[in-house]
């Protein structure tokens, strides 16, 4: 029935037992700057990762015999095939050059390497010998200080491509990119450029084929002189120091270009061979010099221009950023995986134990049956789509109730609709729009029972839900009880995904919180409280957007125990669009962060408050804040791995985590008495729903850190709820009602 006084004055609230309202000024802020920054970060990160992936995983340094058999050599000029190892003007009138007699040009490929290049440089310095180092761009980026040392100690730099591919198998644009990026890396690292090129997997002139010749002609057009070799130490095969020494030793006094390696594996045999080779050949009258000096080239290495140096420095920084990012992503991904596995183990063990304690053979009752009447408060703002079903379901309860519908300034006739139903034991109180906490406080002030159930206007109760949810109050330590909210509109993928989340996420967590005595949230859809406990707190606060979480945490800190009653089932409408879901979860997440910050003092308190702080708040921080923040890392690394790493391994890891989620889902559905059919959509949940959830957390964290305040947003209602069978308007055969 309707209180005529409330109806006349619209905002009247019973004066006795009034609850003070906590008002907080809010301003609606739609933060957008961080999304722009996030987009810039994503674009920059993507570019760095793509470049890093290409440079580190598309090709790479491998043994010199991996390119297969030699092809036809119909287009290779005879003077090149039988000429000297230094080839110039390949695109025009090609000519070659040989080192002068008695001259040795030591050359080292594939470096610089942080272990072996310094040791080789030390050997060269002790013997007062200069050499030529054909560097790989990725190694230059990783160790620019070694390139600077090579140049500073008087050695020559040559280009050995950026990623060490077989250039003959690349498209012309890829060849140009390989040479250009290596040149920029050298310019950025040491401030020089080089016109010397040694293609990977090359050897002597007579090994050139038509594909190789096309590479040499393109390189000549770009201004490069190709440097092959006359002696191959074959140190990459690690045949033993004696064999390396023999391979690098010339026969006779002819000038030689010796091919060796300062990277690409263990080069201890190379270092040992050099310690013997250089003194021995010097004693035989050989002179050691660089490639340029050996063939009389004028200045193959020149200072780089300012533009090239700046571009090179930028390239190095970008690639170093990519390298560091990949290392960080790897650490974060394994951290996220460990946290996920830890959560799964803890939640599953806790859920099993909770089930045994509550419904097993050794389960203990809370105490004598609770039969005292209950006040049910329904805050309503523009709830005409579902309020009738909600109220009728409450009227159909098998427990004595008084139902107080607090209309918070609705403009859609919500209050009139409830009044027109003429249901017994139902009272409507009208007030100007002041928000949900104010409406709850109004209902709390009007309630006549010590036990209070709070119900959202879009929620339908099972007939036994009220009776079931109040039974834990037989224990005088219990101050609040969380019910079991279920999604009613499960049609479509979005509905199924939310249904899975409610069963697997929310309800499994509540079992853990109940067991650990650190329940952080009694949901607004279905929760029961001791009225005197709420009055002692000053009522429902409006300083956060998650008034239910704030209230529950306050009760825990006041020493009350908060428990979960899985048998108290209520059906609620879930958002039916991604936009509505975003708004709901944004409010939930932001409000939860507000409540966590407000009650952070519980971390250092003792007793029930300490359990909330050190168990509940830490759990929320780890699994509802940090883990979602790490989720994008997992996605980015997975995409990176599929493109540049082993896709089978990445897929196997993804399937393993999916299997873990499926096992959790099956167990949670079994505990909740649900059919597992909707779990078929779990794999699809990983591609839209999951991303939406972690973006919500990112948005909420930014909003919280920036100090913005958001206004409470009403959810869309769809009218899919129906009252349970038997909820007629007659009160015949029903439990006694409390007069309004």
Model-derived regions: residue spans:
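N-terminal pre-catalytic segment of deacetylase/amide-hydrolase enzymes
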Residues: 2-106, 113-126, 275-280, 284-323, ...
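Catalytic domains of cell-wall/extracellular-matrix polysaccharide-remodeling enzymes
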Residues: 141, 162-280, 286, 293, ...
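Active-site beta->alpha N-cap acidic-glycine motif
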Residues: 64-193
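A conserved acidic beta->alpha catalytic loop
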Residues: 393, 407-416, 434
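Membrane-embedded multi-pass helical conduit in multi-pass membrane proteins
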Residues: 338, 342, 347-368, 619-706
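Short, acidic, metal-binding catalytic loop of nucleotide-sugar glycosyltransferases
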Residues: 392-401
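Cell-envelope/extracellular polymer assembly enzymes that use nucleotide-activated donors
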Residues: 372-375, 402, 535, 550
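Long helical/loop segments within the catalytic core of UDP-sugar-dependent glycosyltransferases
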Residues: 432, 437-441, 445, 449-450, ...
């Amino acid at each position: 029935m309707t209180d005529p006084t409330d109806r006349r004055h619209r905002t009247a609230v019973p004066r006795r037992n009034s609850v003070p309202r906590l008002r907080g000024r809010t301003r609606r802020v739609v933060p957008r700057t961080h999304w722009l920054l996030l987009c810039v970060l994503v674009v920059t990160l993507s570019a760095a990762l793509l470049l890093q992936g290409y440079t580190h995983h598309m090709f790479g340094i491998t043994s010199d015999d991996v390119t297969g058999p030699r092809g036809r050599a119909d287009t290779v000029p005879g003077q090149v095939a039988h000429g000297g190892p230094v080839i110039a003007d390949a695109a025009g009138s090609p000519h070659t050059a040989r080192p002068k007699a008695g001259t040795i040009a030591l050359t080292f490929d594939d470096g610089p390497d942080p272990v072996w290049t310094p040791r080789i440089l030390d050997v060269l310095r002790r013997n007062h010998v200069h050499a030529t180092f054909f560097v790989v761009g990725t190694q230059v980026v990783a160790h620019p200080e070694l390139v600077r040392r090579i140049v500073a100690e008087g050695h020559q730099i040559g280009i050995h491509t950026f990623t060490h591919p077989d250039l003959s198998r690349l498209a012309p644009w890829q060849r140009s990119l390989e040479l250009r990026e290596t040149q920029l890396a050298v310019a950025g690292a040491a401030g020089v450029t080089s016109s010397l090129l040694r293609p990977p997997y090359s050897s002597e002139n007579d090994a050139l084929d038509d594909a190789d010749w096309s590479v040499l002609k393109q390189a000549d057009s770009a201004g490069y002189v190709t440097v092959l070799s006359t002696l191959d130490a074959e140190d990459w095969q690690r045949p033993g120091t004696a064999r390396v020494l023999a391979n690098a030793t010339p026969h006779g006094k002819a000038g030689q270009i010796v091919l060796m390696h300062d990277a690409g594996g263990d080069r201890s045999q190379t270092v040992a061979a050099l310690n013997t080779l250089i003194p021995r050949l010097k004693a035989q009258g050989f002179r050691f010099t660089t490639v340029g000096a050996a063939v009389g080239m004028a200045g193959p290495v020149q200072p780089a221009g300012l533009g090239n140096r700046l571009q090179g420095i930028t390239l190095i920084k970008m690639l170093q950023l990519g390298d560091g990012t990949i290392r960080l992503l790897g650490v974060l991904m394994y951290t996220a995986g460990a946290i996920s596995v830890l959560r799964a183990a803890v939640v599953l063990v806790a859920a099993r134990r909770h089930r045994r304690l509550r419904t097993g053979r050794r389960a203990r009752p809370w105490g004598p049956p609770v039969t005292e009447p209950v006040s049910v408060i329904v805050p309503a703002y523009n709830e005409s789509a579902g309020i009738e079903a909600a109220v009728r379901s409450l009227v159909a309860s098998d427990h004595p109730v008084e139902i107080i519908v607090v209309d918070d300034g609705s403009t859609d006739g919500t209050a009139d609709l409830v009044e027109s139903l003429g249901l017994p034991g139902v009272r409507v109180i009208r007030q100007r729009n002041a928000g949900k906490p104010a409406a709850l406080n109004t209902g709390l002030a009007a309630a006549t029972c010590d036990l209070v159930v709070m119900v959202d206007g879009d929620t339908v109760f099972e007939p036994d839900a009220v009776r079931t949810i109040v039974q834990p109050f037989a224990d005088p330590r219990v101050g609040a009880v969380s019910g079991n909210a279920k999604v009613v509109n499960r049609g479509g993928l979005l509905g199924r995904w939310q249904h899975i989340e409610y069963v697997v996420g929310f309800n499994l967590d509540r079992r853990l919180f109940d067991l650990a005595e650190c329940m952080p949230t009694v949901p607004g859809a279905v929760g029961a409280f001791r009225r005197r406990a709420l009055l002692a707190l000053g009522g429902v606060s409006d300083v956060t957007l998650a008034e239910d979480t704030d209230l529950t945490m306050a009760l825990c800190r006041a020493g009350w125990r908060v428990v979960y009653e899985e048998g108290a089932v209520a059906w609620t409408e879930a958002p039916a669009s991604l936009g509505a879901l975003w708004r709901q979860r944004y409010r939930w997440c932001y409000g939860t962060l507000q409540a966590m910050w407000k009650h952070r003092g519980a971390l250092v308190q003792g007793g029930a408050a300490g359990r909330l702080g050190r168990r509940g708040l830490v759990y929320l921080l780890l699994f509802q804040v940090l883990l979602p923040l790490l989720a994008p890392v997992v996605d980015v690394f997975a995409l990176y791995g599929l493109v540049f790493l082993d896709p089978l391994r990445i897929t196997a890891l993804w399937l393993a985590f999916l299997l873990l989620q499926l096992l959790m889902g099956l167990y949670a559905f079994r505990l909740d008495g649900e059919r597992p059919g909707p779990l078929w959509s779990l794999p699809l949940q990983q591609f839209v729903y999951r991303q939406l959830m972690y973006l919500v957390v990112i948005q909420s964290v930014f909003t919280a850190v920036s100090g913005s305040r958001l206004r409470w947003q009403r959810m869309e209602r769809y009218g899919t709820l129906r009252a349970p069978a038997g909820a007629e308007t007659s009160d015949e055969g029903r439990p006694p009602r409390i007069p309004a």
